[in-house]
Each structure stands twice: as structure tokens, then as C-alpha cells.
């Protein structure tokens, strides 16, 4: 298993606040329960001018070929607000995003990100402004996310961010909740032997 200590990717700036989950992926595309295939519906109503997805909105930054390989999304406050659909995270990841940087997130969306290993980073508004300034001066600029040291490296700036230690461990070691449980299987079995039988559902 490769340990994920750092990640470097091209940044795409979407300078809009309060982007809700219905904007991230509209409700008509929520008919599947696996995590694959949702990327083509990401920001669907912004990327296309029609319901069939044939008339491309050339003014939307995701359709700018210079950002085709972007994997870090820089945005504003309250990203992922609205309904709790986990499909929003799946769509972002399936499209190719690894990191979302914002000044705040919808609470449920934030936890869904962590559980799916999409890294949500919260920075102050002033720091977000600085990062937007960088992206306006440099097209297809790259940021480095140093998970080990909880730091964003952007040009001449280094910003510290907070992340829950357990979720950070799972992301760095590429473990989901089941994997984490299985790593503690011996401890769980040992504990089960110490408690009364009627506490354990047979």
C-alpha cells in the first residue's frame, strides 16, 4: 500500500459562495447507488445550456480546456450546503477531484467528503482570497497538499489547515471504515469475550 503523504494537483477556481448539492449534481441523476459514472453530471446545469447535455456553456470554467486536468477545486463559503446527497461527493471524485478548498462547508457534505477520502480543507476568508489571487495570475497553477504536516503549499505561501486525526490516518493509509474495523478485529474479539452474551446479537 502506498502511503499518501502529499498530493499535488492543478487548481480550478470557482469564485461562488453557497454552491449547494443540487448544483453539484442535479436530482435527476441520483438513480444509482454505486459511486461510478457520476462525473459526467457534475455541475450539469452550469456546464450545459440544455437538458440533453449537447449545448456546452463555453462561459463555465469547467469547460475551459486549460483546466481539463484540474484535481483541486478552490471555492467560497458554504460549499456543499443543501440536501445530504452523498452523490455530490461521488460526482466530484468521479470527475477527478481529490481536494476541495473553501472557507466553510455544509456539515453533512464535509463528513461525506472525509468518509470518501475527498479532502475538504477549510481556510480563513483572507487566505482564500490570497489563493484566488494566485489562480487569477497563473493559469493551471498547482498547489501541493502536505497531509503529513497539514499544510497547503501555494507559490510562496504555506497555510496550515485542520483535519480530524482519524480521518487523516484513513486517507493517508487509504482505509475505509470497514478496513479500519478489520484492522482492530483481534481487539474487538477480545472485548466481546469480556462482556455478557446477551449484549452481543448472535
Curated annotation (Swiss-Prot):
Keywords: Amino-acid biosynthesis, Branched-chain amino acid biosynthesis, Leucine biosynthesis, Lyase. It catalyses: (2R,3S)-3-isopropylmalate = (2S)-2-isopropylmalate. InterPro entries: 3-IsopropMal_deHydase_ssu, Aconitase/3IPM_dehydase_swvl, AconitaseA/IPMdHydase_ssu_swvl, IPMI_Swivel, LeuD. GO terms for molecular function: 3-isopropylmalate dehydratase activity. Its EC number is 4.2.1.33. GO terms for biological process: L-leucine biosynthetic process. Pathway: Amino-acid biosynthesis; L-leucine biosynthesis; L-leucine from 3-methyl-2-oxobutanoate: step 2/4. It is an enzyme of class 4 (lyase). One of its GO terms (cellular component) is 3-isopropylmalate dehydratase complex. Pfam families: Aconitase_C (PF00694). The keyword Amino-acid biosynthesis applies. Catalyzes the isomerization between 2-isopropylmalate and 3-isopropylmalate, via the formation of 2-isopropylmaleate. Heterodimer of LeuC and LeuD. Belongs to the LeuD family. LeuD type 1 subfamily. PANTHER family: 3-ISOPROPYLMALATE DEHYDRATASE SMALL SUBUNIT (PTHR43345:SF5), 3-ISOPROPYLMALATE DEHYDRATASE SMALL SUBUNIT 2-RELATED-RELATED (PTHR43345). This is 3-isopropylmalate dehydratase small subunit. It comes from Buchnera aphidicola subsp. Pemphigus spyrothecae.
Amino acid at each position: 500500500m502506498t502511503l499518501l503523504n502529499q498530493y499535488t494537483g492543478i487548481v480550478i477556481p470557482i469564485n461562488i459562495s453557497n454552491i449547494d448539492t443540487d448544483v453539484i449534481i442535479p436530482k435527476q441523476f441520483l438513480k444509482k447507488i454505486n459511486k461510478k459514472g457520476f462525473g459526467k453530471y457534475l455541475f450539469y446545469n452550469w456546464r450545459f445550456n440544455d437538458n440533453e447535455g449537447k449545448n456546452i456553456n463555453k462561459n463555465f470554467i469547467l469547460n475551459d480546456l486549460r483546466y481539463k486536468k484540474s484535481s483541486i477545486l478552490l471555492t467560497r463559503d458554504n460549499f456543499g450546503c443543501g440536501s445530504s446527497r452523498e452523490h455530490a461527493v461521488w460526482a466530484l471524485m468521479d470527475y477527478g477531484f481529490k481536494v476541495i478548498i473553501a472557507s466553510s462547508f455544509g456539515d453533512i457534505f464535509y463528513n461525506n467528503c472525509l468518509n470518501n477520502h475527498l479532502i475538504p480543507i477549510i481556510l480563513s476568508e483572507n487566505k482564500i482570497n490570497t489563493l484566488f489571487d494566485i489562480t487569477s495570475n497563473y493559469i493551471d497553477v498547482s498547489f501541493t497538499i502536505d497531509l503529513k504536516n497539514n499544510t497547503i503549499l501555494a507559490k510562496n505561501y504555506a497555510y496550515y489547515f485542520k483535519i480530524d486525526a482519524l480521518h487523516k490516518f484513513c486517507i493517508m493509509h487509504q482505509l475505509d471504515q470497514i478496513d479500519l474495523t478489520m484492522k482492530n478485529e483481534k481487539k474487538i474479539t477480545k472485548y466481546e469475550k469480556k462482556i455478557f452474551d446477551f449484549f452481543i446479537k448472535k
